[in-house]
């Protein structure tokens, strides 16, 4: 038998015995004799013989649902839910709610437990209905609103998520404005996909109102300016990322290059790339700088620049970029480069270009998710760096 189950069930068994003995105890003063129901001993026997399911069924029968046993029944229902037996948990909680003699607090707690049963079972419509009812009860409002936010996130009903989270702000001591900003950003993304730029801008403005330092909203605002041809405003907007979180500058570097070229501002582009690479580094900024040099001055100059840069900044992504570029140079003159095995080795061992890692749960992938697929945390993923690799290989 699972030791955890034994620890959880023993208190229930003790409580059952106490309650049963209390109900069977003679009412005459001084009469010390009492008899426990045989069902109680039967339940203990099932428990000791590692048959917890049968034991639980017996204890349910022993414990009549009234004002004195509600807490024990709620505990029993929770045990079922933790174990994944949602039908049994639901049945117990529905049975409690059906009793006419519950106090208001007991009724609300039973509703909350039943709502959690539905939520875990994926019966989201039923869960939503109960959580909405509980959100109007001061004793359960905060917990119910948190579940509603999760539910609406899961269903991608962002308007409802915003409404629930705004209500939650009244109860929560934690700053949840960044999460509220992310919901507005989700709506902005939908409008961007539909090319509804005015609506997208309105959602981005709302995101920045609740979270002025939102990197995601700043990226989106730059994207709007870029798509409508306001290239200088796009550049100015994206460059604010340098002050917010420069790790994400690589997410917009390609469009920044295009914007400078559309403005025919080659000098501005060279200055920006040089300063950004010196200040922040990173594989995407290095790649953009090398490609720009190769575009303006040719491959030889790009190789010379990259060789010098790797010498001064010995990083894995720099070495990999240099080997790739040298291999391209050799392949242009010979059928097969002697650097190909090294290139293959570096890629197989340290292929982190375009990879992101969640700082909360460690989830890793090649797509930037503003909400981590693993832990569901918002704004937890960031580009993988050489420092991550060194720690991993050590």
What are these regions (language model features)?
Residues 1-34, 129-146, 150, 154-173, ...:
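Long, contiguous interaction/recruitment modules in multidomain scaffold/adaptor proteins
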Residues 32-68, 75, 81-85, 91, ...:
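Alpha-helical segment of the N-proximal tetratricopeptide repeat
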Residues 67, 101, 105, 139, ...:
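Short coil turns that delineate tetratricopeptide repeat
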